[in-house]
């Protein structure tokens, strides 16, 4: 549907105006759903817990009973919170448990030799990118898309989902912008510094500023529907 129209901020508002009642109903349901699950997630996974979690509290591959962060975000209780991150292989999380070999493996599906050191860096990288993102500190070298040494810089679905969860209010929306980069560039162009994360935040700011009657907490659902 979208490729038949000229995508723009003005077109989005025109589309919203024509479908206002239906969109507001959907957005209200989505907002309530996200608010409830977000509160539960934050009780279970306060940001500081990322630094102290064990490897089995992180990895996917050990089954539902493990209640790991990666399982909960992709397949478990929080799979539909803000945005889904399913698809691809378990290696997208950096470290995962391989049932066939009974080994922890990295994103290249290789067995990890220095496991403690490797997992320590992963935890630190995940914590730092979320901590800086929720402060909107996009000038930080972490967010230099070409030079960043943070291993989560390219994992935009997971990072966007966590930014939506850990920020107060609704300064981000639940869409993995990199999956439709050209589409979202019609709103705000993506830059190397800040990448999809700054772009996501700027889109919310732009739409909210241009059309103040659109509540940021409901915008995520509306923008997602518009992008279909």
For each predicted feature, which ranges?
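Conserved beta-strand->loop/alpha-helix structural units within folded catalytic cores of enzymes
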Residues: 154, 159-162
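An N-terminal alpha-helical hairpin/helix-loop-helix interaction module that forms a charged
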Residues: 1-154, 167-228
């Amino acid at each position: 549907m979208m490729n038949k129209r000229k995508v723009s901020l003005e077109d989005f508002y025109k589309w919203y105006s024509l479908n206002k009642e239906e969109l507001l109903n959907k957005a209200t349901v989505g907002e309530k759903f996200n608010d409830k699950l977000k509160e539960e997630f934050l009780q279970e996974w306060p940001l500081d817990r990322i630094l102290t979690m064990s490897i089995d509290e992180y990895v996917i591959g050990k089954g539902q009973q493990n209640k790991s962060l990666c399982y909960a975000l992709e397949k478990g209780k929080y799979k539909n919170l803000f945005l889904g991150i399913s698809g691809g292989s378990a290696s997208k999380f950096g470290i995962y448990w391989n049932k066939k070999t009974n080994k922890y493996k990295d994103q290249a599906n290789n067995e990890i030799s220095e496991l403690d050191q490797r997992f320590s860096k992963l935890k630190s990288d995940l914590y730092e990118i979320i901590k800086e993102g929720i402060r909107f500190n996009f000038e930080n070298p972490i967010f230099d898309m070409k030079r960043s040494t943070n291993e989560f810089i390219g994992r935009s679905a997971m990072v966007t989902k966590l930014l939506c969860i850990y920020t107060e209010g609704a300064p981000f929306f639940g869409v993995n912008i990199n999956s439709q980069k050209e589409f979202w560039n019609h709103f705000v162009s993506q830059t190397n510094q800040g990448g999809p994360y700054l772009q996501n935040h700027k889109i919310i700011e732009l739409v909210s500023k241009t059309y103040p009657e659109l509540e940021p907490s409901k915008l995520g659902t509306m923008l997602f529907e518009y992008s279909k």
